A protein has these predicted regions:
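Low-complexity, flexible helical/coil segments
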Residues: 24-31, 59-65, 99-103, 121-129, ...
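Core catalytic region of metal-dependent phosphoesterases/phosphodiesterases
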Residues: 2-94
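Conserved catalytic motifs of the protein kinase core domain
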Residues: 23, 97, 203
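Hydrophobic positions within alpha-helical membrane elements
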Residues: 34, 72-73, 108, 139, ...
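N-terminal short leaders/motifs
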Residues: 32-55, 152-183
Length: 231
């Protein structure tokens, strides 16, 4: 029921911006677990998927960046909901400003265990083997893994901000900015904390928080970028 309440809040927020937004960018981890079989997708998320479809039917671009909980998005969201899928970081210009958008997993993180897991999750061979398991068991396994991942966090939240000299995404961004000084805004998900940090006179890095605990999002009005909350 808690998850259903969070979903309704997110859907109500998307409904409130459908006549104002020219594009919506979802930076990953929108699902606890998502895996597409050839003819089967996980049950649930009905209201959310319906709202995405409504937005795209209205002509609003919806961009979906795969996160580490929804790595295995196939073509269902694009074919059925009209969503544009991104599996890598995107650099794009919006109203004259340069944006670097990414989920953020694997960027600047030296953790060898995480790198191994990420390689396994992206392995087409392992995905083929996983697809051979009946969804009755494979989806249950995926949901159990996601639940275990959540329960490792304190109060269901990610560790607090570690400071700009320790936060992997900030360190990665600083290094990337050296060779791409024209980028104005770096925006990430993944860490599930709220952060808005100036890196130079013309560049900022934002981590968006999430839609489970913070109900946070960024909005760009053509001139300025704001980190806000819809609850």
């Amino acid at each position: 029921e808690h998850g259903r309440t969070q979903e309704r809040r997110l859907v109500n927020f998307l409904d409130s911006i459908k006549h104002k937004a020219s594009a919506v960018y979802l930076l990953g981890d929108m699902f606890d677990f998502w895996y597409e079989f050839r003819l089967v997708v996980p049950k649930g998320y009905t209201r959310f998927l319906g709202k995405l479809s409504e937005l795209t039917d209205m002509g609003v671009e919806v961009h979906f960046f795969t996160g580490n909980h929804d790595i295995w998005c196939g073509d269902y969201l694009s074919k059925e909901c009209g969503v544009i899928i991104h599996r890598e970081a995107l650099t794009t210009e919006i109203y004259g400003k340069e944006f670097y958008l990414a989920h953020g997993d694997g960027l600047g993180d030296p953790d060898k265990k995480f790198k191994l897991l990420r390689w396994m999750f992206h392995s087409t061979t392992l995905q083929t083997l996983f697809s051979a398991i009946h969804p009755r068991w494979s989806v249950e396994l995926g949901l159990t893994w996601a639940k275990h991942s959540r329960e490792k966090r304190v109060d269901g939240k990610e560790p607090d901000y570690m400071g700009e000299n320790k936060e992997h995404l900030v360190l990665y961004t600083k290094e990337y900015l050296k060779s791409h000084p024209n980028i104005n805004f770096f925006i990430y998900g993944h860490r599930h904390i709220e952060l808005d940090l100036m890196l130079s006179a013309t560049s900022r890095v934002l981590i968006l928080g999430d839609w489970i605990n913070y109900f946070s999002y960024a909005v760009f009005d053509g001139e300025n970028l704001f980190l806000e909350e819809y609850i």
